[in-house]
Amino acid sequence: MSKKRSVAKENSSDDTDTIISPANDTAENGAAMSIAIVGMGCRYPGQADSADSFWQILTDGVDATSPIPADRWNNDRLSSPDPANEPGSLRAERMGMVHDIADFDAGFFGISPREAAVMDPQQRIILETAYDALENAGQTLETWGGQDVGVFVGAASTDYMSAQLIYRDGINGYTNSGSALSIIANRISYQFDFKGPSLVVDTACSSSLTALDLACRSVSSGDCQMALVGGAVSYTHLTLPTNREV
């Protein structure tokens, strides 16, 4: 990852991200502007780290779930056939797991190890997939840095923030920004020097679709020249799943 990104940055100068841009100018008769999807990046269970590998999983009918590893939680202690009547337990033997969720090339993005340590995985992964989407689109930060590029992200999970409050040893001056949902989008805009609208929207399961709708409206209205649209959700801790069949 580091080598690939370093080469891309040198030669040309992130969870799912999609880049959309106007396919043509608004017609003189007032017809709606066409919108084109020009690049994509993603991270999904089953080690799908690109649109091509994700599509391969779908076409091959691959089961992308896997047994719950011990480094996530002790499932033998927490598992129950009747979680509704056993507080603090859950029924789950397998999970859709994004591998290497703790890995992050902080130095590539100019982020200090101290700050990276308290960044929500949603922030880290979507920053990487945003960069991947730009590469996939054949776009460079030299071209779009400082331009009116919008960033619209759908996100709703705050379990990493909850974990920070429970396990307080790692809290530092970056914890607030590192766990805030709004920063998922704002960090991309800051790191890439994008000057367009930058926001996170939470409409539960429709968050990403709502973000896409807002991005299309923003591009069509001229609020931004191009938009990066994404969605992020990760559950790193058991506050939400416990007492539920998952």
Model-based region annotation:
Residues S2-R5, I20-L238, R244:
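Cys-dependent condensing catalytic cores that perform Claisen condensation/acyl-transfer
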